[in-house]
Curated annotation (Swiss-Prot):
SMART domains (alphabetical): AAA
Modified residues (Phosphoserine): 13
Keywords: ATP synthesis, ATP-binding, CF(1), Chloroplast, Hydrogen ion transport, Ion transport, Membrane, Nucleotide-binding, Phosphoprotein, Plastid, Thylakoid, Translocase, Transport
Residues annotated as binding ATP: 172-179
Gene3D superfamilies: 2.40.10.170, Bovine Mitochondrial F1-atpase, Atp Synthase Beta Chain, Chain D, domain 3 (1.10.1140.10), P-loop containing nucleotide triphosphate hydrolases (3.40.50.300)
Protein name per its UniProtKB record: ATP synthase subunit beta, chloroplastic
Enzyme Commission number(s) from the entry: 7.1.2.2
GO CC terms of this entry: chloroplast; chloroplast stroma; chloroplast thylakoid; chloroplast thylakoid membrane; plant-type cell wall; plastid; plastoglobule; proton-transporting ATP synthase complex
Membrane topology, record value: Peripheral membrane protein
Gene source species: Arabidopsis thaliana
Amino acid sequence: MRTNPTTSNPEVSIREKKNLGRIAQIIGPVLDVAFPPGKMPNIYNALVVKGRDTLGQEINVTCEVQQLLGNNRVRAVAMSATEGLKRGMDVVDMGNPLSVPVGGATLGRIFNVLGEPVDNLGPVDTRTTSPIHKSAPAFIELDTKLSIFETGIKVVDLLAPYRRGGKIGLFGGAGVGKTVLIMELINNIAKAHGGVSVFGGVGERTREGNDLYMEMKESGVINEQNLAESKVALVYGQMNEPPGARMRVGLTALTMAEYFRDVNEQDVLLFIDNIFRFVQAGSEVSALLGRMPSAVGYQPTLSTEMGTLQERITSTKKGSITSIQAVYVPADDLTDPAPATTFAHLDATTVLSRGLAAKGIYPAVDPLDSTSTMLQPRIVGEEHYETAQQVKQTLQRYKELQDIIAILGLDELSEEDRLTVARARKIERFLSQPFFVAEVFTGSPGKYVGLAETIRGFNLILSGEFDSLPEQAFYLVGNIDEATAKATNLEMESKLKK
């Protein structure tokens, strides 16, 4: 990535560095700005347009330089709406890239892409700011320790465990529960690990952003009485905002997370919902800048843009950033260039299945499609590894038998296969779990299940200890003891009906 000479020398007065230009052309969110000869801004510099529109309303639009065109002109992308701008308006070169507030004062607050608070709680009490464009940490600074990050979600911890300081992708089409799973992870991690999180809402629904904020206040993740005790900072650049804002909001969130890692030396969680919208915004900006599109209409710089963001999300010897990224899969096609490029950067993938969601099994995590580089005996231990492999083998055999069952029925299967199917159906249901953040919808209190409990439960099902219990006893419960209690209740209810 290019570095800006102006950012490395804070002693130079920014006032001296400010150059004045004029708007020469406006095409939607893209501005061409003419500067005096020899006063051209650098790539990624922030430009600010101030003035009044025809109705006398104040205008304050920040842009980012993307191209130097020649003839003393630059092309910049606006971070907010360009309504009211006119040719000839003055444009100030700030001499630096966009800088956003960082540190403890950001916790409990909502920011836009420019680092401005948008929660009506007044200014942010910090003088510390950081530019959103930086190089990734040097190779020698990186930390390579391998350890599991327990989430309290059975299907994740058992079959596709997350790496502390790793990158995890949540893959799924529209409406299969990506955002609910992210909200549950924020809730569990804040309560169980006491970690600090940064949430980047990239191009998603404003309503979901508002719901998330309200639920965080209710659950105590954001402490309204004492914001300093909050566990999360929120950065939103939602669907209705210009592509420039959606393209850069991920970097704003990442910059805040980097400060907690590098200066406060903390372990941080960075949530990005949705990384596909980052690619989509980049595609829009690329088209507006006149670049030739690549495969499926995406920008030719897709891999570079993704790599620039992802390589900064890493663990150093000071602290770690564990990143969980929702990845919208267009038309459920995993070979689309956007999800395919994202795959290359991930340590674990949690794939959400429409088939499981249709069955009512939530979280709708596909146990066979989800993967993790952490599921190795030397990392997770022999017992965990063996249990996970047996669960996968049982579910795989059930999947193979489904066609035979659909055509001939269960009675045509061998005794051994019928037992496999019965256990697989119990496992499938036991992989479901009531969520804390979904209590209002399900009416069931949320459950956090430790890894040891999860392994014990699945071992008991695989050993045949619960072959006599009905499969509905395993649906939406926490640990295995709750399943046995539910089976007893179901038996009593059926006796009463008789």
